[in-house]
Structure formats: C-alpha cells, structure tokens
Amino acid sequence: MNNNNYKWETVGNAKFYTDGTTCTDIEVMDNAKTVSFIYPKFKIDRETCQKVFSSVENLIIERNVLSIIIPNKMFPNVKKVESESSNFIDGKYLIERTGMRLRNAFGQNENAVIDFTQFNRIENYAFEGCKAKNAVGLTKTRFLNVHGDAAFDGSGFLDQPFIGGIKCLGPFIIDIDETVNEIVLPEKIRYCVPKRPQKCIRVSDIDTLSKIRKLPQKVIIEDDKMYSDDALLYKLCSHDIEEIESHISRYKTIDGIVYSADMKTLILCPRGKTGEVRIPDGVVRIRKHAFSHTKIKKVIFPDTLQMIGDEAFYGCAELEEIDFGHGITRIGENGNQSMFSGCAFKKITFPPQIKEIGMRAFSLCYELEEVIFNEGLEVIQKEAFQNCPNLLEINLPASIKKVGTDAFVYNGSYSHIPDMNINITTIPENLGLAITHPGNTYGVRCVNVHIDNRNGIFDFVLPCSVSVIVGARTNIIINQMADCKYAKKLSGLRYLETAYMNASNSMYKYAVAYKTYKKAKNKCAKEFLLDNQKHVAKAIILEMEEKDFADFVKFDFINLKYDEDIVKCLEERNWTAALAYMLEEGKGRPEDALVI
C-alpha cells in the first residue's frame, strides 16, 4: 500500500482516509446517526484503530461496495444496516451475502436476542463488544458454523459461568476452563475453541471428540450407543491421550488400554502411552491399528495370543523391544500385514514356535541390525523385512521352506548401503526374488550368498537390482540348487558366478564384478576385471570408497596405467593417496605403494 495516495475525504457526516478504492480509517462527526459507505473496500484494523462512534445507529452501504472489514466495537449502537450493494444484505447485522457470513453483530444490549438463523458463518471478532447474552436459532440450521476461533472473543456470551468445565452457546463450546481436572462434554457439538482441558474429559457421545482439537491426557467413555470399535480408533487417535477409561459394558480398560468386555481382544492403546506394556493373559487377538504410532518402548505378549491385526504396531517410533511369548505361531495370519512396520527395533529374536512372518511385518525398520530366526520358522512372506538398511546379516534356519518376493530387499533412496550377507543350509523356495529387485538402484549394493549344504559350499555375489527376466532366471537357478541330483550337474552355477553381468546398469556391473572377485576369487570375475580395468576403476571412484580403489589396484593381475580421466575423477573425490599413486604410475613404485 502506497500511503502517498491516501487522503481524507468527507462524505456526509463522516471523513474517510482513502485512495479512492480502499478506506483504512474513519472519523465521524459528533452526534451523527448515519454513516454511508461508498468506497469499494473498507479495511480497518481492529488492533490499531480503537475509535468508537456510539451515536451512529444506521449504516448505509452503497451499490459499488465490495467488502467491509471493520472493528465490531467501532459502532456499538448500530440498529440497522441498509444495503444497495449486492454483496451485503439488509438487517440488524453486517452480513456478507456470499456464504451468509456474519462480519459484525455490533454492540446490542444485554437483553438483546441474537438470531443465529440470519447467517451461516461467524467470522473472527464478530461479537467483540457485543453485550447480548441470549440467542435463538442455534439448532435450527445445520449450516451454521464458526469460521474463526476468535468469533466470540469479548462478547457477552462469555459472561456465563462454567458448567462442567465449559461454556456453551448451543452446540458451540466457546470457552474451556483449563484449570479444572475434568471436563464434561455435551452430546452434540459443532465447534470447540482450541483450548486443552488440563487432565480429563468425559464423553457421552464419541462423535463429539472430532470437534475437540486439543485433547487431555485422559478420556472417559460413557457412550452406550457405540456399536463399532473403529469409532474408538478414529476418534481417539490424538497423541495427547495417554489413558482411556471405559464406563460402558462394551469395553474394559486396564492401565488405560481398551479391551473387549470378555478380555479376548485388545482394541486400542492410546497414542500417548509410554514405557512398557504387558498384555494380560487371556487376550487372543490384537486388533488392527491398536498400537499404531504409540510411544511405547516394550511390549510383552501373553502365551494366549493367537493373532495380530493389520498395522497393529505400525509407526511405533520408540518401540525397541518385543517379547513374543510362547503362544503366537504366525505373525500376519489371515493376510494381516505391516504389523511392526516403522518400529525402532535394533534386535529381534523369534521364538521357536513362530512358523510364519507375514507380509511387510517388519518393513521400514531403519534401526534394525540383527534378527535371530530359530528353527521352526517355515515361511517369510513378501516384503517382510523390506527397506531395513542396517540389517546386513541374515542366517536362515534349516526349517525355512519359502521366502517371499522382496523379503530382504532395500529399494529406498539411500545410496551408500553396505552389502548384505545371507547364510543358509537349506535353500528355500523363491530365495532369488527375496534378495534381488527389478529396476535401477541407488548405489552399488550387493548380496553375498553363502550356501553350505549337502551339495557343497557355494558363494555368490548378486547385484541387488536386476531386470525382471534376470531376476526370474536367478530365482529358478537357485531353486534348482535345492535338488541334490540337479545341483551336481548345474550348468547355471556359472550364471550365478557371473551375476555381475546382469546388474541393472554398466557402472553397477563393474562395481559388482570387483566385489565378486574380492569375495569369491572366481576365475570369470578375474578375467572380466583384467579386460575392463579402467571402467572398473572409474566405477569404484564414483560409487565406492578410496580403500576399495586401493584394494583393486593391489590385485596382482591389475596393471592400471596413468589415465587423465581417472585422475580427474580422483581429484573430484579428493582422494589424495589414490591420486598420488596414479601420478607416480610408471616410476617404478613397489606393488604395495598405495596404502589407505
């Protein structure tokens, strides 16, 4: 706004500070009864303008007026608004036609009755300075809503006493006593001020909770009309709630956690719950989402537990420890999935009775470093440990029969993820698809496969990312190795030994070839490195560490000559030792000249 264009102009009984389009200030002559608004826009700030014109009783809005924003206290005694503008309506209040928005109720007196059927939306400070304490029509229109949290600030409606810790205006909670221990909510609420009850809230209609934007630590349920457990999940999902107490026959509550009346199903743990949770004996099922996003650190299952629902512990970012007990045999029964996705485990030990780990059961556990699978485990479903970048060592038990697609794959955006080692004595069905993934990769991660079974000892280095066709063929060959007769004449062994040739891009291929020879010392990889020294060196510089470059050039068959392109890459990585080595190339340096 350029104040140089503004000036005072007199219109009738008033003067307006305006640039001809927008008015930002008003002065009214003493004893003036009427003020006419003639400019397109009126925008007078309630904080900077404290003027009061108590003599004015009528406001006239001319045809070309588009918007009016003025302090409600400026004209405390207005009784009538006359509008020739299509943007406002005639009446006792200043109401915008679009949306039927109440801008100003004006002063009114204590005995005045505000008719809430005249508008559908209440703007901020619409009742500031309004002395009226009575209202009609609050429940007659389902369209009525409060648009601003300061709508009733400074109004006579707030002069009423607190009842049950709240002040209500029909279906609107306009104030909350934040000092009392308990708040009692009415059954029907359409709006609540953004204040938080200090300790506890008592609820007779669970649907009202959706209007309470700041919940206390404890919620008491007294809604006998509840017929769906989902209502608890969706209405009580606030991180502020630490304890739930049930006063209805449908539920029992222990330590703030909700169970079915027969204590066979754990239905909901409040998200604010912390510390250790010991689930009581007799509980058979944990319902879907029951612990999702809670703050618990440890959970102990009873021996009676049989089933864990979808995403039951999803996103428990502080859950570090779990005791499975001796009862549950399948984590992810009946298609349930993502039960523990996104938790904070560093180590998981599965007891011997666990036979199956379900789909995505422990995916996205970024802190997970160690998993102990006991004998008895038969099936690991697809994506069970997907995107666990710190899970680098997998030892599968001899009892394993099948591993699902992408069970141990990392396909996230981190580029420098260490290689994963997988050790097996029994080859489960689908192992190839469980550890490789179709598509490109971020970085050069590999899987080192060690098989020690009755057919012999085999070591392969597989690229994590391959084409769909290559992944399928790799899987078939690994599956065939489970057949004793076939394994002894397996022509596909060479295919696995040269798996680097099937990496998803050329740079990846050279890096995997280096890793293959370093790990398995096979002849094919040696010949490949010998024929592609420069490409391999460049791949190592771009994707790996300086020590890898040193190890590569120390291979007794490698004779990497000075190359400007390689020198440039080394300079960009600031690998000073490797750069010095290349610059000294050809000067008769000893074989072990490069030390990192």
Model-derived features with residue positions:
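Structural signature of tandem-repeat unit edges
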Residues: 1-123, 128-146, 153-170, 176-285, ...
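Gram-positive cell-envelope targeting signals
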Residues: 1-3, 593-596
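Alpha-helical elements of the RecA-like P-loop NTPase motor core of helicases
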Residues: 210, 362, 385, 580
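Extended alpha-helical scaffolding segments
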Residues: 531-593
